[in-house]
Amino acid sequence: MSEAENKLPFIPEEWSNAASSVSCSSLQPVIALVCGPKNSGKSTFSRNLVEVLLQRYKRVAYLDTDVGQPEFTAPGFLSLTIVDKSILESDWTVPCVKTPERCFFYGDVSSKRDPKAYLRYVYTLFDYYQLHFCKSSENKTELPLVINTPGWVKGIGYELLVDVLRYVSPSHVVKINISAYNKNLPAGLFWLDGNDDETAHLIEIQSAYQDRYNQSILIHKDARLMRDMRIIAYFRQCFKGKEVNTIKELTHELASHIPYEVPISSLTINHLHCQIPSSEVYYSLNASIVGLGISTEVFEDLPSCVGLGIVRGIDTERGILYVITPVPENLVEKVDLLLQGYIQLPTCLLEVKDYRSPYLSANVLAST
């Protein structure tokens, strides 16, 4: 087996049949929501489903509602991405970063902190999909939609999933079950009550336990590590064309990279989920990850977010923020909102030895 094949996931026959059932459906548009407990394989199945749909459609819409481990963006985002080429051909050991069609910066890795804001973002992204890619007209072609969901399926997480299911009314729901029965979602069309006239094609499959060699493939992901990898993959885009293969190389490049100078007077700073005293605003921004928003580009009164930036330094005398971001200059010039949440720089970028990088290294003077 080739090295490339080794990097592809094993797709069980049951999963292949489920994906084919969705793809071959006569229902239009195809709106497939994938749900199940954490570590059940939702992301893997969703990516495979996109691949199967691309065999029939030129493009597939992907609505990612998992703010902790999103598929195509850095953590903290809710996004709608249009996929027009194979994603299974990419190396599955490396996070796949794509530019979304529309995204919002929620600013945390769990919907627990602000469920109402979370639902509003999800609903707005779905409305955007319906308006631009679903409703039939002479100039529009309906795109199938795959919705990936978080693995938090108990308590508030369960209630949020039910709310999303009722709002989007999917044509297909793929429910992945694991061996720990008490961690699974309820049986049947659990999100519908007796008064609902709507229905959906429910497909229940088992989590993939073994590969083609009958070896266990259950991987308990380190959530923090996965988030750090996605943040690293995102900011590596600042250095396209350069060989940046190690954490040390990335830290060096980030520290030496020429940042954008952004006048503080041109910005509105929005602290998500918390209140920051005015005397500590600059201190809180320094060496932080922020969402870059454009207030003039709104949909349903929500400003768009064009990406993330690292505030590498602040010149309070000149009133300048120094920001590193892979966002193109023509978009950075439009940014007038800084959205600060709880997405943090990976500690590995702060602890690289043998290199002193201002704001990106822990340089502590020894006590005397």
From Swiss-Prot:
The name this protein goes by in its record: Polynucleotide 5'-hydroxyl-kinase NOL9
Organism domain of life: Eukaryota
Lineage: Eukaryota, Viridiplantae, Streptophyta, Embryophyta, Tracheophyta
Assigned EC number: 2.7.1.-
GO biological process: rRNA processing
GO cellular component: nucleolus
Subcellular location: Nucleus, Nucleolus
Free-text function comment from the UniProt entry: Polynucleotide 5'-kinase involved in rRNA processing.
UniProt-annotated binding residues for ATP: G36, P37, K38, N39, S40, G41, K42, S43
GO molecular function: ATP binding; polynucleotide 5'-hydroxyl-kinase activity
EC primary class: transferase
Sequence similarity: Belongs to the Clp1 family. NOL9/GRC3 subfamily.
Keywords annotated in UniProt: ATP-binding, Kinase, Nucleotide-binding, Nucleus, rRNA processing, Transferase
Keyword flag rRNA processing: yes
Organism, scientific name: Arabidopsis thaliana
